[in-house]
Amino acid sequence: GVVQHIGTWVRALQRSPWVFTFTQEWPLGSQAHQLSYSIPFQRASRYSGFGDAAINYRYQLVAADARVAFAPRLSLLIPTGSESRGLGNGNLGAQLNLPVSATLGSSVVSHWNAGVTAIPDVTTYTIGGSVIWLASPVFNIVCEALWLGQTNGERALVVNPGVRWAHNFASGLQIVPGVAYGIGVGPSRGEQSAFFYLSFEHRFQAESGRE
């Protein structure tokens, strides 16, 4: 199996808030079953601290190497952030994501996701999509769009053009950095953000016959 360690950092360029999230994903018996956790550390308008954590289970329902792949994910949201400081919601929540990936050609793939997050008093719906040009085996150009709507009337729409590249090592370790620039459109017009991504992926167990 493969273990993945992911760090992301997002900052709104017009304001001081930012969020760093660390995610670690492990196989459960096979690569088809994945268990992960996400822990955010963030700065709100006045305070900094840990936000609400998440425990996630993902099932690869349709194989990742198929032309169309499907891996639904269910998450439990844990109120580890301070609600009074604006760092958390103060309640348990649940989240469902339905991501689909499709190979559109020899060098173009697309990812789509529909999600719903439920906590007391508000439900959030998300729809996202991206197109990725595999410019080379280790360099990709990405354009992503994400829409968010809440039952309290909040709306957001952001387009994220960016790039990512890979460093592959003989040991099986793969390091993937990425950067993107968020552009708010529609209800988010005028907003801008910076996004940084870094992942480390390696085998969970040594190959047979190796230490």
Please give the residue ranges for each predicted region.
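Transmembrane beta-barrel domains of Gram-negative outer membranes and organellar outer membranes
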Residues: 1-211
